[in-house]
Amino acid sequence: MTLLYLVRHGETIDNVHRIMQGQTQGELNEKGLKQAQEVAEQLKNEPIDAFVSSDLRRSIHTCEIIAAPHHQPVRITPLLRERDWGAFTGKYIPDLSNLKNPALWPKDIESIDAIKARAAEFIAWLRTEYPNQKVLAVGHGIINKAIQSVYYDKPMNEILPMSNAEIRMLEL
């Protein structure tokens, strides 16, 4: 069994400004840096075998901070990348009046089926690459929700959103 510490990246400048980040790099703000340091402190004595991050800067930075006390490298994978929000990327979220109605969304947004397929691929990859190990993975709000949706075999809307720098444990 692989034990997964699933973490969402620390707070970013765009989180605060309510900008749809999607697959943009993003930068941690002061609070986000502090959140990552708090997770590092909380887990510094946990025997974690590997650290994995999305290939987006906000997650890499969070993961590097958490991994530092363990003196371990961070492995990067695009499987943990946030949902591609297409034409919504970079937009002010409150201005997206049709956000609650997917039928009205632009056609270039990554589908739920596609993101869940990526989440399933990530879980399979972890089981293969890190059998019987403890792995900390830093991702994003929607991909982390998709991973949990696949893991628990529940619709994504039944998975509670993760706060910035929140940790959830999954036994794979």
What are these regions (language model features)?
Residues 152-172:
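Domain-level recognition of soluble alpha/beta enzyme cores
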Residues 53-54, 117, 138-139:
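Short beta-strand scaffold positions
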Residues 12, 143-144:
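Short active-site segment of divalent metal-dependent hydrolases/proteases
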Residues 4, 133-141:
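Generic beta-sheet signal
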Residues 7, 11-72, 99:
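Active-site-proximal alpha-helix that buttresses catalytic centers in soluble enzyme cores
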Residues 16-19, 86-90, 150:
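Short aromatic-enriched loop/helix-cap "lid" or pocket-rim segments at secondary-structure transitions
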Residues 68-120, 124, 160:
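Phosphate-handling substructures
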Residues 45-47, 126-134:
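Glycine-rich phosphate-binding loop signature in dinucleotide/nucleotide-binding domains
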